[in-house]
């Protein structure tokens, strides 16, 4: 499989958002969450770049971020940062489901 550039950029964007949250507001939870989710997404992009992609980590992390930030966006009504991360996470979900759908199989089946 080719390198999952979208996944790596998505991971870097989430991590950079956490760093920006810390730099602007001194938010240590934002820094921790941004770096943790960025690391998970980066490792997920690495798994997607293997000969047999394994998209579940990136899909699960994207789904969790979309839900978490979507709820935050709904409460605050502010596009930045919650709305932007929610939309980016939904885009990552759609892209990964479209790209890696044949690698999402029930347990006990073999990869193509």
UniProtKB/Swiss-Prot annotation:
GO molecular function, one term: transmembrane transporter activity
Membrane topology: Single-pass membrane protein
GO annotations of cellular component type: mitochondrial inner membrane; mitochondrial membrane
Matches recorded under Pfam families: Tmemb_14
Gene3D superfamilies: Transmembrane protein 14-like (1.10.10.1740)
Transmembrane helix as UniProt keyword: yes
Residue spans crossing the bilayer: 3-23
InterPro entries for this protein: TMEM14, TMEM14_sf
GO biological process, one term: regulation of heme biosynthetic process
Chief localization: membrane
Domain of life from the UniProt record: Eukaryota
Location in or out of the cell: Membrane
Key words of the record: Membrane, Transmembrane, Transmembrane helix
Family affiliation: Belongs to the TMEM14 family.
PANTHER family on file: TRANSMEMBRANE PROTEIN 14 HOMOLOG, TRANSMEMBRANE PROTEIN 14, 15
Protein name in the entry: Transmembrane protein 14 homolog
The organism of origin for this protein: Drosophila melanogaster
């Amino acid at each position: 499989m080719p390198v999952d550039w979208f996944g790596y950029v998505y991971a870097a964007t989430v991590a950079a958002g956490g760093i920006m949250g810390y730099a602007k507001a001194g938010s240590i939870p934002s820094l921790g969450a941004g770096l943790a989710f960025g690391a998970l997404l980066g490792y997920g992009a690495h798994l997607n770049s293997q000969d047999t992609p394994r998209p579940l980590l990136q899909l699960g992390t994207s789904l969790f971020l979309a839900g978490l930030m979507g709820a935050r966006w709904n409460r605050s009504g502010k596009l930045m940062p919650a709305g932007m991360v929610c939309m980016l996470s939904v885009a990552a979900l759609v892209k990964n489901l479209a790209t890696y759908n044949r690698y999402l199989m029930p347990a006990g089946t073999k990869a193509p």
